[in-house]
């Protein structure tokens, strides 16, 4: 997890505005994506951390699990989930990114193959069947539990515009990081956004 950054916010107290810090967290992964090996290595370390990737989505099953978690397919509080980039199907969103990014290269590769068995029919499927990660996930959180504890739902939903700006900025600043889906969770104490 990246070290929380903070920005100033103003709070009205005793007839005057006072400045306070608003925490900003940029998580590069979570235990739900961490491989069994990474969990085992981390468990053996005093710090509980590992240098092994834990933001990687390693196969189609992991991607399906991310879809269920991020979209709360198992929950009745779907009204507290907002997808602001992509659709309500993260698996298809990732497949679409693969098509957009790799289809031309796949066709060119296939045109250069003399043997049919070396041609790639579906690049997403090929990566899923390999040992390579198929996607990764980051989490952006603005504010912390102390900040959000006393905020009502209407105030929380104002964050949609802020998170939209975060996605636009990420696309602009890191254009090679392709975003398939961005979903905000308002169902926890501190709203946060999952980006795949």
Task: Identify what each model region corresponds to.
Residues 1-196:
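N-terminal nicking endonuclease/strand-transfer module with a His-rich metal-binding environment
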